């Protein structure tokens, strides 16, 4: 985070003589800031412990979440407490040597949080847009390399310019006694803001908009599938030859399935809208004010402190918003914390996708399972019911994201299921049986 370009001409602020003054803020301000600090530290610590202790959550996708929660935890433990003292006392009350160090950690932790949000959006983008290639592209070493790159960029944008004095270029202002408001020139503010906010936020908008378009396209494709001549159930469509069609049931089930996918597309739109709104509401005012302050010096210290804490609150909301839309996090939290309600687990195919599940496997939006049982014996019960050997039975399963499917009618013979969307599935064993011979 870029500190406020306050009225100082050195990275070492001036302190007035005597003991620190009494807090100038009211009691409710101190209480509110303490609640924000405790909630930030507790929520991020809980989710880090949850991922580390639950085997179901230890996967490549959650590497980025651990990095995000770590940066937000550092904001709550290292950045917020001195900032609270600064806001309450109106001056820097800690050791003067800690001012520059605290400012550097402020920039690094907040920048790392924003860059980790960008990595999470990239991970979701690859998972939804290229689910079959996700495991090949997003391996554990590549994920760790991306995380290391994000933290390195955040450190370079914070410690290096401050230690070398690049933030003071072109500035000549009188110092304010007792203040720890770092001098920042317009070039430094523009470069730091562009690298740590505007470029990552553009990438976040691009990836989430592509995900939203993919969700809507999937809903349209499913709706077009339900308008075919085949009988579409709510989650199971069975084509059997011969079979008597029932047009009334076709149209009703098709409308029901289309409506459900339309609702899911709308829910995905609202989810992305909430995430993007929270991100820009918390951080955009701060960076706009930073640029305005560097240009015209027209932002009061009180208003800048409010905008700074608004950006800090993004680290409080991240551990609440992101797991809120992840079902596996809810179930793991229910097992980890007994008082938390654990939603029931749905039986879903490993190929079923969800933007907000943290599994790293490839899971496309539509799972089609082809079931090809061999011809049944002439004296089987199915022949007497259908009037002859049924020959070929095709089962196409439309699996909605994150939902359980209805159990199909029990087959007369156990079919061989081939899932074409699971890359590491075992090859099925094919055996030949002559027509009319019994199968084991």
UniProtKB/Swiss-Prot annotation:
Residue sites binding serotonin per the record: 106
Localization, UniProt: Cell membrane
Quaternary organization: Interacts with CDK5. Interacts with MTOR. Interacts with RPTOR and NF1.
Membrane topology note: Multi-pass membrane protein
SUPFAM superfamilies: Family A G protein-coupled receptor-like
GO molecular function, one term: serotonin receptor activity
Note on domains (UniProt): Specificity for G(s) G alpha proteins is determined by the length of transmembrane regions 5 and 6 (TM5 and TM6).
Keywords: Cell membrane, Disulfide bond, G-protein coupled receptor, Glycoprotein, Membrane, Receptor, Transducer, Transmembrane, Transmembrane helix
InterPro entries, A to Z: 5HT6_rcpt, GPCR_Rhodpsn, GPCR_Rhodpsn_7TM
Record function comment: G-protein coupled receptor for 5-hydroxytryptamine (serotonin), a biogenic hormone that functions as a neurotransmitter, a hormone and a mitogen. Also has a high affinity for tricyclic psychotropic drugs. Ligand binding causes a conformation change that triggers signaling via guanine nucleotide-binding proteins (G proteins) and modulates the activity of downstream effectors. HTR6 is coupled to G(s) G alpha proteins and mediates activation of adenylate cyclase activity. Controls pyramidal neurons migration during corticogenesis, through the regulation of CDK5 activity.
Pfam families hit by this protein: 7tm_1
Cytoplasmic side: 53-62, 123-142, 210-268, 326-440
CDD domains noted in UniProt: 7tmA_5-HT6
PANTHER family referenced in this protein's UniProt entry, alphabetically: 5-HYDROXYTRYPTAMINE RECEPTOR, 5-HYDROXYTRYPTAMINE RECEPTOR 6
Listed GO CC annotations: cilium; plasma membrane
Cystine crosslinks: 99-180
Residues that span the membrane, as ranges: 28-52, 63-88, 97-122, 143-167, 186-209, 269-295, 302-325
Membrane topology, Extracellular segments: 1-27, 89-96, 168-185, 296-301
Residues carrying covalently attached carbohydrate according to the record: 9
Family statement drawn from the similarity comment of this UniProt entry: Belongs to the G-protein coupled receptor 1 family.
Single GO BP term: adenylate cyclase-activating serotonin receptor signaling pathway
Name this polypeptide is given: 5-hydroxytryptamine receptor 6
